[in-house]
C-alpha cells in the first residue's frame, strides 16, 4: 500500500523537496508498513516558506474581506466534493476508522472554511461618539502566522488554524505532526485550486527542530499550536521571548459527571464517545467518568456490555468502529498505562488486551478499556493517556464531585449528564474547564469557541473569538474641531 505525495513540502503554490532533509517515513498504523517517505524541512525550505508568506501577505490583507471569504468558501466546496479521497488519506495516515474520517475530519475543516469565509465580512471595528470628536477601531492582520498541528485530526486542525488566519488577511506556514504529514498537503492543493494566491498557505514537514525554527523566526507574528502540555510550554516560552501572539490548544484529563437521574443510555453513549472515538486520541476526552453511587453498578454493567460490542479491525472497512493507535510509541504508552492501572489497584472491567487480528499483526491495536474502582490519586486518573482507556470513579454528592473534578492541573473540558437542568447549569458554573457540555460530549461546532483553562491552553479556536486572536486592534481618534493646546 502506497500513499506517496508529489513532494514533501508545499511552498509558494507548488510542491518542493530538499534531499538534504532528514527522512520522514509515513507509517500505516494498521500494519506498521511504510506507505510514504518524505523529507524534513531544511533551513533553506523554512526560509523559502516564510519569505513566500511574507511577500504574499500584504496584498492579501488589502483585499475586501468578502473577496477573501469567497476563496475560503470555494475551498470548502472542494473539500466536500473530495471527502471520500481525503477520508482515505486520513485513515491511512492516522489509522482512524473510515466511518469516522468520512464524517469528522475533512467535513469539519470544510465547515470551518465556510464559517470564517462568511463571518469575516461582518467582523468590523466599532465607532465611538466622543461628543464632537469621534473614534473608530480597525481589526488588522498580524502578518505571517505559524500553525503547528497534532496527529489526531490532521486536516481538521489545519483547517481550524488556517481558515481564521487567512480570513483576517494573514498568511500561514503550517507544520503537520511528523506522524501524519499527508492531508495538510492535500489541503494546500485545494486552497490553490480555489484561487488562494501563492505563498499564503505553505506546508513544511519535520520534527520538533522545524517547529522551533518556525516559532523563533523574526518574521513570524503569531503561533498556534495543538499538542501536549510539555510541547505547549516549550513553544510558549520561545514565542514569549520574542513577544509573539500565541494560541495553545493542549491536553486534558477532563471530568464527565453522571448524576443518578441521568438518562443512563445517553450518559453511557456520551462516556463512550468521550473515551473511545478516534481510538481515544482526543484532547478533550472525558477520561474521568464520575458516576453517582445510586446508579454506579448499573451504569458499569451496561457500559461494559456496550463496550464489548465495539468492532475493532481494518480501519478501511466501513463496518469497523475502532482502528489502531497512531504509532508504535503511542501504543507502547497506552499499553503501559493499562499496566499501571492494574498495578495501582484499579479493577479491569473489560478490555486491556492487544487483540490478534488476521492480516494486521504489525498494527498498533488495543482493546477499548474500562477501569472501575479508580481513585483520584491513581496515575490513570491524573495523567493524560491519549488512548481508549476510561476510568470510572464513584461519587456521592454534588459538592464532593465538583471538588474532585477540579482537582487537576488541566482544564480543557467537562461534561454533566442529568435531567435536573438547574443543577446542570449550577455544576457547570463551578467546573474549571473552558469547553463544557450538558447531556452531550465532544461536540465541537465551529460556531462556538473551543479551548481550555489552566494548563490546557491559552486562547480559543473557532467562532468569532478566533478572528480576534488572528488580528490586532488599532484605535483611531478623529478631531473635528481645533486642537486645544497650551503652547
UniProtKB/Swiss-Prot annotation:
The modification Cysteine sulfenic acid (-SOH) is found at residue 283. Its EC number is 1.2.1.8. NAD(+) binds at residues 149-151, 175-178, 228-231, 251, 283, 384. Keywords: Metal-binding, NAD, NADP, Oxidation, Oxidoreductase, Potassium. K(+) 1 binds at residues 27, 93. It holds the Pfam family Aldedh. The active site is at 161 (charge relay system), 249 (proton acceptor), 283 (nucleophile), 461 (charge relay system). It comes from the Bacteria. Binds 2 potassium ions per subunit. One of its GO terms (molecular function) is betaine-aldehyde dehydrogenase (NAD+) activity. Its cofactor is K(+). SUPFAM superfamilies: ALDH-like. One of its GO terms (biological process) is glycine betaine biosynthetic process from choline. It catalyses: betaine aldehyde + NAD(+) + H2O = glycine betaine + NADH + 2 H(+). Pathway: Amine and polyamine biosynthesis; betaine biosynthesis via choline pathway; betaine from betaine aldehyde: step 1/1. Disulfide bonds: none annotated. K(+) 2 binds at residues 454, 457. InterPro entries: Ald_DH/histidinol_DH, Ald_DH_C, Ald_DH_CS_CYS, Ald_DH_CS_GLU, Ald_DH_N, Aldehyde_DH_dom, BADH. Belongs to the aldehyde dehydrogenase family. Dimer of dimers. HAMAP family: BADH. Involved in the biosynthesis of the osmoprotectant glycine betaine. Catalyzes the irreversible oxidation of betaine aldehyde to the corresponding acid. This is Betaine aldehyde dehydrogenase. It comes from Mesorhizobium japonicum (strain LMG 29417 / CECT 9101 / MAFF 303099). The gene is betB.
Amino acid at each position: 500500500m502506497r500513499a506517496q505525495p508529489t513532494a514533501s513540502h508545499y511552498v509558494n503554490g507548488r510542491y518542493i523537496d530538499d534531499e538534504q532533509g532528514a527522512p520522514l517515513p509515513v507509517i500505516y498504523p494498521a500494519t506498521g508498513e511504510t506507505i510514504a517517505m518524505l523529507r524534513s524541512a531544511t533551513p533553506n525550505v523554512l526560509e523559502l516558506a516564510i519569505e513566500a508568506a511574507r511577500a504574499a501577505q500584504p496584498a492579501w490583507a488589502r483585499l475586501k474581506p468578502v473577496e477573501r471569504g469567497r476563496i475560503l468558501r470555494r475551498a470548502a466546496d472542494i473539500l466536500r466534493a473530495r471527502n471520500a479521497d481525503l477520508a482515505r488519506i486520513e485513515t491511512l495516515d492516522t489509522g482512524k476508522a473510515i466511518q469516522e474520517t468520512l464524517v469528522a475530519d475533512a467535513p469539519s475543516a470544510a465547515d470551518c472554511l465556510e464559517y470564517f469565509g462568511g463571518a469575516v465580512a461582518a467582523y468590523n471595528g466599532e465607532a465611538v461618539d466622543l461628543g464632537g470628536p469621534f473614534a473608530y477601531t480597525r481589526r488588522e492582520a498580524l502578518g505571517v502566522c505559524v500553525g503547528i498541528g497534532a496527529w489526531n485530526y490532521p486536516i481538521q486542525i489545519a483547517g481550524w488554524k488556517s481558515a481564521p488566519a487567512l480570513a483576517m488577511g494573514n498568511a500561514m506556514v503550517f507544520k503537520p505532526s511528523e506522524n501524519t504529514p499527508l492531508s495538510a498537503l492535500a489541503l494546500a492543493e485545494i486552497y490553490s485550486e480555489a484561487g488562494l494566491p501563492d505563498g499564503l498557505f505553505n506546508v513544511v514537514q519535520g520534527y520538533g527542530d522545524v517547529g522551533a525554527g518556525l516559532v523563533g523566526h523574526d518574521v513570524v507574528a503569531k503561533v498556534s499550536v495543538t499538542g501536549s502540555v510539555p510541547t505547549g510550554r516549550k513553544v510558549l516560552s520561545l514565542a514569549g521571548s520574542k513577544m509573539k501572539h500565541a494560541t495553545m490548544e493542549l491536553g486534558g484529563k477532563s471530568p464527565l459527571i453522571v448524576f443518578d437521574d441521568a438518562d443512563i443510555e445517553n450518559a453511557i453513549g456520551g462516556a463512550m464517545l468521550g473515551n473511545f472515538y478516534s481510538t481515544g486520541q482526543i484532547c478533550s476526552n472525558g477520561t474521568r467518568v464520575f458516576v453517582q453511587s445510586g446508579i454506579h453498578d448499573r451504569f458499569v454493567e451496561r457500559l461494559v456490555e456496550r463496550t464489548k460490542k465495539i468492532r475493532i479491525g481494518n480501519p478501511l472497512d466501513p463496518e469497523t468502529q475502532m482502528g489502531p493507535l497512531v504509532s508504535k510509541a503511542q501504543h507502547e504508552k497506552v499499553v503501559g498505562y493499562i499496566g499501571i492501572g492494574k498495578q495501582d489497584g484499579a479493577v479491569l472491567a473489560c478490555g486491556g488486551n492487544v487483540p490478534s487480528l488476521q492480516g494486521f499483526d504489525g498494527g498498533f491495536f488495543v482493546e477499548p478499556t474500562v477501569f472501575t474502582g479508580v481513585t483520584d490519586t491513581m496515575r490513570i486518573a491524573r495523567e493524560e493517556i491519549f488512548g481508549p482507556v476510561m476510568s470510572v470513579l464513584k461519587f456521592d454528592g454534588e459538592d464532593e464531585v465538583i471538588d474532585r473534578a477540579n482537582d487537576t492541573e488541566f482544564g480543557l473540558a467537562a461534561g454533566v449528564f442529568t435531567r435536573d437542568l438547574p443543577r446542570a447549569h449550577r455544576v457547570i458554573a463551578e467546573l474549571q474547564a473552558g469547553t463544557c457540555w450538558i447531556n452531550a460530549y465532544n461536540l465541537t461546532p465551529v460556531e462556538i469557541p473551543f479551548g481550555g483553562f489552566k494548563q490546557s491552553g491559552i486562547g480559543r479556536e473557532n467562532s468569532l473569538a478566533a478572528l480576534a486572536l488572528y488580528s490586532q486592534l488599532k484605535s483611531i481618534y478623529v478631531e473635528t474641531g481645533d486642537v486645544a493646546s497650551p503652547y
